[in-house]
Amino acid sequence: MSKPFKLIFLSITLTILFTSFLLMQGKKKVIFFGDSITQAAIKPGGYIDLMNKMLISKGLDKDYELEGAGVSGNKIYDLYLRMEEDVLMKKPDIVIIYIGVNDVWHKQTSGTGTDADKFQKFYLAIIKKLKKDNIKIAICTPAVIGEKTDYSNQLDGDLNKYSNIIRSIAKNENLQLIDLRASFLQYNISNNTENKELGVLTSDRVHLNEAGNKLVNDEMWKVISEIK
């Protein structure tokens, strides 16, 4: 390759690299931090996948980079223990925390849930670390463990209690709240006329089906799109 062609090739390569760098610099990195519900969200049809497709369709994919950081079985203290590697080191602009189902559910299934006071303590510790790095935060209430609308799901009481903890944290820490607990109940009241335990927004009382993923995507995007 002659010298002029080498210079032209180098110039084009540098231009492409610089343009790519500028595009990456302009993107808001959003990390979704949670348990198996978040882990499944990156799969086809999951709410992170749906959001990526929505961003592309709206021409907003140049503005956002979405990344899932969900691990099956995680509870609040698991998030605290792995947040350095899975969140902070990746330098996100926005973090969406969706946790709490296992903290309640595992009390019943294996006796390894999280007491309410410890749940709040670990949650606040996570918030403190994220704020220290000037990361924007939105937090979600745990949606459902059973979809019945007459408050006869066995763990409704605990889910409401932990959801209220999260609502209080959002208010006291001036954070964006994505109230999935309220959104799921409202949807089920309108659409679950047979008072079914599952099959409306979940496949198994907890994990999301197609309609559940769409609802979570819609509710999360309402908040993410408003974060500057």
Predicted regions and their residues:
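Serine-esterase "nucleophile elbow" of acetyl-processing enzymes
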Residues: 17-72, 77, 82-91
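Hydrophobic alpha-helical membrane context
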Residues: 15-18, 47, 191, 216
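Bacterial Sec-dependent N-terminal signal peptides
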Residues: 1-27
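Alpha-helical cap/lid subdomain in secreted, periplasmic
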Residues: 2-6, 25, 52-62, 78-228
